Amino acid sequence: MPQVAKKLLVTCALPYANGSIHLGHMLEHIQADIWVRYQRMRGNEVHFICADDAHGTPIMLKAQQLGIKPEEMIAEMSQEHQQDFAGFGISYDNYHSTHSDENRELSNLIYGRLKENGFIKNRTISQLYDPEKGMFLPDRFVKGTCPKCKSPDQYGDNCEVCGATYSPTELIDPKSVVSGATPVLRDSEHFFFDLPSFSEMLQAWTRSGALQEQVANKMQEWFESGLQQWDISRDAPYFGFEIPDAPGKYFYVWLDAPIGYMGSFKNLCDKRGDLDFDEFWRKDSTTELYHFIGKDIVYFHSLFWPAMLEGSNFRKPTNLFVHGYVTVNGAKMSKSRGTFIKAGTYLQHLDADCLRYYYAAKLSSRIDDIDLNLEDFVQRVNADIVNKVVNLASRNAGFISKRFGGQLADKLADPALYQTFVDAAQSIAEAYASRESGRAIREIMALADLANRYVDEQAPWVVAKQEGRDADLQAICSMGINLFRVLMTYLKPVMPSLTERTEAFLNCELSWDSIQQPLLGHQVNPFKALFNRIDLDKVNEMVSASKEDMVAAKVVTGPLAEDPIQDTITFDDFAKVDMRIALITSADFVDGSDKLLKLQLDLGGETRQIFSGIRSAYPDPKALEGRLTIMVANLAPRKMRFGISEGMVMAAGPGGKEIFLLSPDSGAQPGMQVK
């Protein structure tokens, strides 16, 4: 009995519209796309949507810095994001924005229902206010020490170390991220969502199978510590949706951001005309809703979001699929090391399918972090895809094309081996369905090894030289091509670009069910290179370009722009320089020079004579007498036509009249070493 097709709505977390997509973001979108492509291959109806998260103070402030309107900035960012996702083959049916008419309408609707049902409370709160910038500070614009685990440098809404949530006023030693000032408390009326009212429902939903075990266990900790009412409002100035009947008050970005899933789908429904929004979002919906998210936003998606939906009479998610972070070469992504790699930078240097394959090979249904080791990345893709999979086609296709006009044999050379490949479909399907793509890849590569062993044993290059064995040669190579077809069918969710080229070569569409029947007597097209080996030099170029991205992103002005920092030295190099405090006992012009002053320096028991090019900045040298300065005491003496200079005084500035002799703080004495 054929399986009844399911109707699925799938989302990824909404990228924030104030910055570029990087390879850390891409993990989630690739994982979701692999799952979506698999579901489509199995005949399920899938609607895959996303949007830019386009509201909040960070966007407002960045737009101000750029001198443009927030609307203009988010439009440019959306175009860049969509271009990056398309470049990686992410098969979204719709990509929208939270700053949309659909999202405003739905946000107002959900808020109105929550208010009508008694789940919105208002009260006056004391809120952190930046006295220098004249604005209330959003949670993410205050940093301090976590009140729970005491980790420093944590945001004002939740701790990235222990996962705790709290009010910004609970932070220890808070500072404004905007100005660095210490915030002050000011009163303001705010609106709160009554999250504790949903505690019982949320605990039942948590254990319903909607969450991974690791997430469910973490939520239990939050339940035990007690749920708090959630502040859903922000004060002007703010870029977002103004709360109905509350002038100067705006929805907090985390209220309208998840509603953006609904807004994007509503936009798709309106564009298509054959989709029913209510069928997917009404409370008794029989469709399935899946959110792929990172572990850093579990709290919002596992508590606030289902509670908001429940309180406004909409359906809850079927599952949250949570993943870990991406590290590069075993460490946090770093701009200075060039491992903070933008998606666009990657696409300028490498094939998107390479990263898709590498992530797929490492992903599981757990929340483990994924390490993108760049050397292993090169080796694995080349070994698996180039040497095993694509090579299987290339070493057989030449004979089929040249000797048999592209015609495959009418019979299978080894039906039992082919059946082994087909029988693996169920296990690989189960792996894909459960987001165990790493297990699927391992099984596929084990089959690739079998296929290559078959070709090695049959040695078509030897058979080709033997008279009267044309039928054997055609059968062997046709078998190799058929095994390649099965492998590529299994890899289709992972590598869409390679799949497209493969389908062009094989002259047929790759589908899950069609592998039951091998290609017999089938005409294939002339073989062209399907996949290029990764060159480590290309990876290094990408890393170098990522460093350049960082430099370009930071517009350096002032002294650093005119006189950049020189190459790094070791501490041992620095330790060779002996700097001492010196007292200027006399300072005079040098006859015959319009640049130099002659200084006599007392080192506390030793006197030095120094010629220094600071005359233009100190037209009255006598003003320097009696002043403490810093000199390099172990610089080799330099013979000049005016005498011998026995060191160098320290000064800053570009030159000319802008030279500033360095002086130590009060209390320093001649002869003291500067360390």
From Swiss-Prot:
- Annotated tRNA-binding domain ranges read 573-675
Q: Where in the cell is it found?
A: Cytoplasm
Q: Which reaction does it catalyse?
A: tRNA(Met) + L-methionine + ATP = L-methionyl-tRNA(Met) + AMP + diphosphate
Q: Please give the positions of the paired cysteines in each disulfide bond.
A: none
State whether it acts alone or in a complex, and with which partners, per the record. Homodimer.
Q: Which CDD domains match?
A: Anticodon_Ia_Met, MetRS_core, tRNA_bind_EcMetRS_like
Where along the chain is ATP bound?
335
Q: Name one GO cellular component term.
A: cytosol
Q: What protein family is recorded?
A: Belongs to the class-I aminoacyl-tRNA synthetase family. MetG type 1 subfamily.
Has UniProt tagged this entry with the keyword Metal-binding? Answer: yes
The residues listed in the UniProt record as binding Zn(2+), with positions renumbered to this chain, are 146, 149, 159, 162
The UniProt keyword set, sorted, is:
Aminoacyl-tRNA synthetase, ATP-binding, Cytoplasm, Ligase, Metal-binding, Nucleotide-binding, Protein biosynthesis, RNA-binding, tRNA-binding, Zinc
Q: What gene name is listed for this protein?
A: metG
Q: What is this protein called?
A: Methionine--tRNA ligase
Keyword Acyltransferase appears in the UniProt entry: no
Q: Where is this motif: 'HIGH' region?
A: 15-25
What cofactor does its activity depend on? Zn(2+)
- Per the database entry, which stretches of residues form a coiled coil? none
Tell me the organism. Answer: Serratia proteamaculans (strain 568)
